[in-house]
């Protein structure tokens, strides 16, 4: 009988993530890629890579994520709501955890794990999400990792409306125009 691997596919608003676990829950494969709005193509690229690497295995799989329901239906795979999937994973692999914070491409989620499970989500505004961070990085002509490097070198903190992407973009432009010291350490 072929050995089994368990595959999880998470399709978010901007990325596709694939992870494969052994029956003993050891991570065998993990990929995180931007789908550039072509979810099916990126999912197929990652699953083809997985199939080549584990051709002699029997595979169980399920899909989660805001963009995963349609893909699950097309592929005939079970769908699990992402907050439930990540809660189960954290409770399984890190049972000492009190809080899960997830910054998605277009929303934020927080799950409290004390005295039961309390899950909350901010889906009304993209401020502080992955898409927001990407946009701010683009405005500063760096990638998301480059923002961290800029922050390490900064000599001053400038106020930016972090609750709203529109106001943050306006604040960033205004600060840059009105300050000769803006990101002087770049």
Which residues make up each language-model segment?
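Adenine-nucleotide phosphate-binding core of ATP-dependent small-molecule kinases
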Residues: 168-176
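Short beta-strand-loop/turn "lid" adjacent to the catalytic site in phosphate-handling enzymes
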Residues: 23, 32-35, 50-84, 111-120
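Glycine-rich phosphate-binding loop plus the immediately following alpha-helix
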Residues: 115-152, 156, 164
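Short beta-strand scaffold segments in enzyme catalytic cores
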Residues: 16-21, 107-113
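Short glycine-aspartate micro-motif
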Residues: 4-10, 60-62, 96-101
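Short glycine-rich, Thr/Ser-proximal phosphate-binding strand/loop in the N-terminal lobe
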Residues: 3-41, 45-48, 118, 123
């Amino acid at each position: 009988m072929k050995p089994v691997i368990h595959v999880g596919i998470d399709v978010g608003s901007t990325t596709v993530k694939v992870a494969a676990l052994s029956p003993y829950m050891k991570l065998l494969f993990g990929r995180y890629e931007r789908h550039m709005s072509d979810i099916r193509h990126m999912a197929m690229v990652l699953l083809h890579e997985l199939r080549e690497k584990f051709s002699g295995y029997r595979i169980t799989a399920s899909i989660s994520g805001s963009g995963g329901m349609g893909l699950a239906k097309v592929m005939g795979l079970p769908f699990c709501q992402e907050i439930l999937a990540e809660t189960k994973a954290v409770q399984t692999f890190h049972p000492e955890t009190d809080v899960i914070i997830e910054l998605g491409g277009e929303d934020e989620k927080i799950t409290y794990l004390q005295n039961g499970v309390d899950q909350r989500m901010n889906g009304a505004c993209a401020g502080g999400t992955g898409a927001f961070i990407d946009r701010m990085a683009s405005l500063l002509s760096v990638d998301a990792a480059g923002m961290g490097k800029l922050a390490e070198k900064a000599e001053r903190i400038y106020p930016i409306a972090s609750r709203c992407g529109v106001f943050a973009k306006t604040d960033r432009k205004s600060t840059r125009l009105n300050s000769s010291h803006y990101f002087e350490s770049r």
